[in-house]
Amino acid sequence: IDPYGNLKYQHYDNSPAYTADYTDEMKDRLQKDLSSYKNFELFAITDTDFMNIYHHYSPYCFVHFDGPHMTRDVLTEAVWFANRAGTNCRFVFDDYPKYNMPLIQSALEPFGFKKLEAGKNKICLEKRRNNL
């Protein structure tokens, strides 16, 4: 899920809105690079539009969160997907030190998510069977 198109928005909790380099050319390159993955599908829309349009889709088994990087937006997305996550679903969060990951982890605990692994810039949470 990524609209691309050089949109101006607030990228981080403590930064003003600005335009980054997420161009349509980058989108084209991504689609070409991932074209051999038959199950890959890019939704070139905002996360809010995706959640409004595809609210009936579930269950999800894997979600990679790679933007936005504001705590409130990541939290909104994480809870939305957690409500639709199947058992053993994994959530991978990119650049997690840039937002309030402890808050997000805490919010996901009632859904059964526990930390599986954490590195310098990525963290993986997994939904355990029966919230164990």
Tell what function each PLM region has:
Residues 1-132:
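S-adenosylmethionine/decaboxylated-SAM
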